[in-house]
Structure formats: structure tokens, C-alpha cells
């Protein structure tokens, strides 16, 4: 075998290896785009599955992950960048509260467990080891469950108020929790220390709380409040609570406006109107304790909404329709406030970013502050 022949073989082998690596990298990018939106589907035909969208390609659908059967009501989603595991809380067709764990790297369901006595909008510790799972707004239990994220086993109960609903773990912590308790304790927002499990609270507010969002330094929290056309803002440092009302709103009782969040730069708070009104209110938050209503957006559907959140960079705002609706989730340019598209119905969604085949950062189901 001549030297020239050997050299040619080595060159061809090198080209083959490079081509194979490029093809593998291209396939990984197609499967996991650098900025991916993972959205748990709510429509009746696909409820509980997860659609993945390429955010940098006009939210092009990339894949749909078939997960578990018999999902009746999706209650929340959380993900750990540290472990690559994603968690979905849901109620099945029998009314049992469940959580399933998905491995983001291979799209497989790792476990699917019933959590007694129920589940609601869960969150995960930044280290990926523990889930904090409310016991359902329609229940009567006076605690939330702390769950081993690796196995689904409940390892602790934290008692404080009944009908626990939305848990949140903002960038600066601690664990936040609201409840739908009718005994007066639902008029407070609870803070739970993730190390000692000591509990403190902010309030009372004007009524029972709904969705809320905390800024990046855990200095301010914005809240939906039952019966209020507007929002309340609390200083977590002083305990002061102010009320910002919508001057021109539909007639009648507000009920509970459902959906609120900071833009990542914290310059604005977006707030959904009622479940039948297609408006989204945009508040100027340059002075968090003196919000100014600056704009009102109108949804394409002409109907109401139930949730909203943002991507990590602040490019997009996502406004979800009422629960289990066939209406799509509308995408807005978060800077210009223009509508730029619609994806399938989902209010349980978050961003996952990839670099070199690994998760580089993760977003949140809430519109938390990121400044």
C-alpha cells in the first residue's frame, strides 16, 4: 500500500468523521433548538402532551412529546437545568392528583406518580432535588407536599393554610405560596424558607389572592386579587401594599382576573382581564409602588385569558386562553406589544435553552422578574 494511498484513506476517514459529527449536531439542533419553548398542551385532543417550538424560527413546531394518558386538567410545569428533568402536575380523569417527570434529553417519562391528596402549580428547588407541590385549590388540606424530584416520594409536609394553589420560586427565593382559603388566610401571600421551612406572610390583601409574580430581587410582588379590577403590589421589604385600579373596565364584578407577570427587564407588568374579556393591561412599573396603566392589548380570539408569561430575554409575551380551551396561546412582541403569532392552547409553558447539546438555562411558567 503506497504512502499516497494511505494519505488518501486518512483524508477520506477524516471527512467522514467531520460529516458525521456535523450531521449529529444538526440533528440535535433540529430536535433541541437553542431556544426552545416547551408547552404542555391543553386542547382535548392532545391534553398532557408537550409541544416543542423553535423560538428563533417563528415558533416553528419541532416535535410533540407523547407523555401520559388520561390527563383531565394540567395544573403546572417546572424544569431543572441542573438535572435535565421536567415535571408536569395534572389531575387525571378520575380526579387523582398526579405528577410526571420527563427526561428532557431523551424525551422519555421517568416516573408518573399520584401525590396525595392532590396537586396544583408546582415549583422546583434550583438544585433540582426537591419539588414543592400544592395540594389543590379545590381541596381542604392545610399543607403543601415536599417531593423528592428523583423518585416522586413525598418527604415532608409544610402546614400553614388550606386550599393551596400557586407555588413560585423566584430568582432570589424563597418559596412563595398563595391559597384559596375562605377562612381569611387566603388573603395573605406566604413565604416559606427552603432550608428551615419557617413561614412568614404578607397581607392582608383586599381579598383572596390569585396569580402573582415576584421581581428578581424579591423586593416586590404583583398580585391578582378577587373582586378587583386591577392589581395590588406589595413591598416585600416593608410590607406596604398599594392598589392600582383599571379606570375603564367592563361592567360588573371582576371576579378574579387570572394572569399577571413582569417583563424580564421589570419595566412593565402585564395583567389579563377577565375570562370573558379579550383585554390585557400593560402597566408601567418604573416606580413599582405607583404603577401607571400605559396600554391595553386586545387578543385575536375576542375572548378572555387565564395565564401569561414571558421568555427569558424579554422578546416574547405569551397569553393563554381560558383553561382547556381550543383557542390558541397568543404570542406578542414584548417590546412593541404587537401580536406576532399563535401556538396551540397551553398555559403551562417555559423556555429551555441548549448549547452543545446541554441545557444552558431555563425559563419559568411565571412571568418573574429577571433584571
Language model features with spans:
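Bacterial N-terminal signal peptides that target proteins for export
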Residues: 1-9
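Bacterial N-terminal signal peptides
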Residues: 9-17
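Predominantly soluble domains enriched in secretory-pathway, periplasmic, or organellar proteins
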Residues: 16, 24-371
Amino acid at each position: 500500500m503506497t504512502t499516497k494511498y494511505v494519505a488518501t484513506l486518512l483524508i477520506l476517514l477524516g471527512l467522514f468523521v467531520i460529516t458525521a459529527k456535523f450531521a449529529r449536531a444538526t440533528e440535535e439542533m433540529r430536535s433541541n433548538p437553542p431556544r426552545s419553548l416547551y408547552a404542555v398542551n391543553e386542547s382535548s385532543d392532545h391534553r398532557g402532551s408537550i409541544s416543542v417550538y423553535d423560538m428563533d424560527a417563528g415558533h416553528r413546531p419541532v416535535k410533540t412529546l407523547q407523555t401520559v394518558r388520561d390527563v383531565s386538567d394540567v395544573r403546572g410545569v417546572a424544569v431543572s437545568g441542573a438535572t435535565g428533568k421536567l415535571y408536569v402536575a395534572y389531575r387525571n380523569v378520575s380526579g387523582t392528583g398526579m405528577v410526571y417527570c420527563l427526561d428532557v434529553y431523551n424525551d422519555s417519562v421517568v416516573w408518573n406518580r399520584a401525590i396525595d391528596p392532590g396537586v396544583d402549580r408546582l415549583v422546583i428547588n434550583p438544585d433540582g432535588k426537591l419539588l414543592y407541590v400544592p395540594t389543590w385549590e379545590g381541596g381542604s388540606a392545610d399543607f403543601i407536599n415536599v417531593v423528592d424530584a428523583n423518585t416522586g416520594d413525598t418527604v415532608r409536609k409544610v402546614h400553614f393554610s388550606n386550599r393551596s394553589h400557586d407555588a413560585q420560586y423566584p430568582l432570589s427565593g424563597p418559596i412563595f405560596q398563595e391559597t384559596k382559603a375562605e377562612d381569611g388566610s387566603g388573603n395573605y401571600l406566604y413565604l416559606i424558607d427552603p432550608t428551615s421551612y419557617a413561614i412568614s406572610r404578607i397581607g392582608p390583601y383586599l381579598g383572596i389572592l390569585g396569580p402573582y409574580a415576584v421581581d428578581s430581587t424579591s423586593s416586590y410582588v404583583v398580585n391578582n386579587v378577587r373582586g378587583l379590577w386591577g392589581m395590588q403590589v406589595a413591598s416585600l421589604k416593608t410590607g406596604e401594599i398599594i392598589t392600582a385600579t383599571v379606570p375603564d373596565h367592563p361592567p360588573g364584578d371582576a371576579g378574579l382576573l387570572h394572569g399577571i407577570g413582569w417583563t424580564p427587564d421589570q419595566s412593565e407588568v402585564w395583567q389579563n382581564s377577565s375570562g370573558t374579556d379579550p383585554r390585557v393591561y400593560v402597566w408601567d412599573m418604573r416606580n413599582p409602588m405607583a404603577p401607571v396603566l400605559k396600554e391595553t392589548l386586545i387578543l385575536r380570539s375576542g375572548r378572555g385569558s387565564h395565564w401569561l408569561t414571558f421568555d427569558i430575554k424579554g422578546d416574547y409575551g405569551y397569553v393563554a386562553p381560558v383553561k382547556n380551551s381550543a383557542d390558541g396561546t397568543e404570542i406578542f412582541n414584548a417590546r412593541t406589544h404587537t401580536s406576532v403569532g399563535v401556538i396551540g392552547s397551553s398555559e403551562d409553558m417555559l423556555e429551555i435553552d441548549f448549547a452543545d447539546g446541554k441545557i444552558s438555562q431555563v425559563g419559568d411558567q411565571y412571568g418573574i422578574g429577571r433584571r
